[in-house]
Amino acid sequence: MKITSRKVVVIGTGFVGTSIAYSMINQGLVNELVLIDVNQDKAEGEALDLLDGISWAQENVIVRAGNYKDCENADIVVITAGVNQKPGQSRLDLVNTNAKIMRSIVTQVMDSGFDGIFVIASNPVDILTYVAWETSGLDQSRIVGTGTTLDTTRFRKELATKLEIDPRSVHGYIIGEHGDSEVAVWSHTTIGGKPILEFIVKNKKIGLEDLSNLSNKVKNAAYEIIDKKQATYYGIGMSTARIVKAILNNEQVILPVSAYLRGEYGQEGVFTGVPSVVNQNGVREIIELNIDAYEMKQFEKSVSQLKEVIESIK
């Protein structure tokens, strides 16, 4: 698919949707940004607020509230709409309500004649990415969930903070569900190219126990933020904007998005967070890491949980 207008539609103007819009404008990613919400006044108000800062943006951008007809010639439709996760809830607790919302939204988008790429940020994202694909009838590669992009940035940030190293020099992934069953891939985590398990032998700032604690901290990061401020949105806003950038610029970059497995990691028939090459066509291919036996077992458990939920909402 060739990117033509750099037009992006964001559906859902809550905290996440507006954070994504704000991030895209500040990074100069789009030429036209359309906001859609069930509350038209909210969408119009957010568009006006964003427009007030356009003179300070990198590029002049058309920002407006719209409707589903605007999806027809959009390059990307980002969906963030849904019920928010509340304190004490897991992301999977949201599934039934948000699956109905997702089906309704995707149906209306496709009725417009949309022929671009979907980016899904609504939770539980792996399940709702599957629902979006199933409803749209598009090829799986054109439905991209945010997956574990946010978890991965949290992972790198926490490890970098512990080691007092720039996060950009830390490489590693969280894979599987964006949620409680996610898996830290320590077997492929490196610091400046050096495997983490080799690195900690000579580094007294971190030990094996710290690695386990760090994984748990990353897994529970959203709960901590929700307890303190009721919602998470800046991190996922920037993470989603990064995916949009990769698509619009045809980057061929590897990001841990929620992608459809066709036998990779011994799994199929499910969307989940795995390192994937992202370009203007969505997911070009999945990078299959040779993870260790423990990580594979945890990944299989994560995928199994997702499949159970998918079966329950069919």
From Swiss-Prot:
Q: Which residues carry this modification: Phosphotyrosine?
A: Y223
- Catalytic residues identified in the record: H178
Name one cellular component (GO) term.
cytoplasm
List the PROSITE patterns.
L_LDH (PS00064)
Q: Which InterPro entries match?
A: L-lactate/malate_DH (IPR001557), L-lactate_DH (IPR011304), L-lactate_DH_AS (IPR018177), Lactate/malate_DH_C (IPR022383), Lactate/malate_DH_N (IPR001236), Lactate_DH/Glyco_Ohase_4_C (IPR015955), NAD(P)-bd_dom_sf (IPR036291)
Q: Tell me what controls its activity.
A: Allosterically activated by fructose 1,6-bisphosphate (FBP).
Q: Which UniProt keywords apply?
A: Allosteric enzyme, Cytoplasm, NAD, Oxidoreductase, Phosphoprotein
Chemical reaction(s) catalysed = (S)-lactate + NAD(+) = pyruvate + NADH + H(+)
The residues the record assigns to binding beta-D-fructose 1,6-bisphosphate are R156, H171
Binding, substrate: Q85, R91, N123, P124, V125, D126, D151, T152, T153, R154, T232
What is this protein for, i.e. what is its function? Catalyzes the conversion of lactate to pyruvate.
Q: Which family does it belong to?
A: Belongs to the LDH/MDH superfamily. LDH family.
How is the subunit organization of this protein annotated in UniProt? Homotetramer.
- Name the chain's protein: L-lactate dehydrogenase
Organism of derivation: Lactococcus lactis subsp. cremoris (strain NZ9000)
